Amino acid sequence: MPYEEIDGVPIWHEEHGDPAGPPLVALHGGIVTFHGSFGDVLTWLSDGRRVIGVELQGHGHTPDTGRPMSIERFADDVAELIDRVVGSGPVDVWGFSLGALTATSLALRHPAKVRRLVLAGSNIRPDGYHPEITAPEQDDPRLPNEEEFAAWQADYEAFAPNSADFLPFLERMQPVVHDLAGWTADEIRSISAPTLLVVGDRDFVRLDHAAEMLDLFPDCRLAVLPATRHTEVMQRADQLRVLVGPFLS
């Protein structure tokens, strides 16, 4: 089975594409699975690359063992997985939402492991989100709808070792993202990896915050996808291929 026991958590990972190709670590969004985030882009992304899809603690096939969860722990888990599966690195890292926060932390805590960063639907501070995201109203169009939420729950119940624990896990995950202190301007300026930011124009992330991130990351590009909500960013496969493919190459 494709698990690595890291700090008491069996971390699921799976590989796609060319085993001899340049390695890319793919980090999914919160509550969802690797395929739930990267399924629409995997065909072209794995063409000529070694794609390593990771499922973080409590997500997909990886159990929630009760270990305290944080973005920093997730990043350290990924760093150890890179050492075991790839070697010392560096690797390209593409993270979406929770995965992008994890990728940012990875680049800060383990800079030698990261060659290039793709950060989709990400912020660097809690105030980078529109305020209704962390204090949501039921009818806000930026938020996941009932159909999307039901699909996430169905995936959880299909793959999770703790398949009946979706709602308790949801409660455990809330503070991991919403209570994140974020990073200072100087910390972000210290990231040397070339970075591509991708957000939707109807994302959780405020566009002025995305522009601030563009200014802070030393070697950075920003793409804004039109008519795109947060949950739709990774579904824009053709647009992402045009944006991400050349950047990684």
Predicted regions: what is each one?
Residues V9-P63:
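Conserved HGGG/HGGXW glycine-rich cap/lid loop of the alpha/beta-hydrolase fold
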Residues G39, T43-S46, I52-W94:
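Active-site loop/oxyanion-hole signature of alpha/beta-hydrolase fold enzymes
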Residues L101-R109, V114-W152:
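Flexible "cap/lid" loop of the alpha/beta hydrolase fold
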Residues F159-D186, R202:
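Hydrophobic, aromatic-rich cap/lid helix
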Residues I191, L197-V199:
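Short beta-strand/loop motif that positions the catalytic acidic residue
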Residues F204-H209:
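Conserved alpha/beta-hydrolase "acid-adjacent" motif
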Residues L214-T231:
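Catalytic histidine neighborhood in serine/cysteine hydrolases
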Residues T228-A237, R241:
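Catalytic histidine-centered segment of alpha/beta-hydrolase-like enzymes
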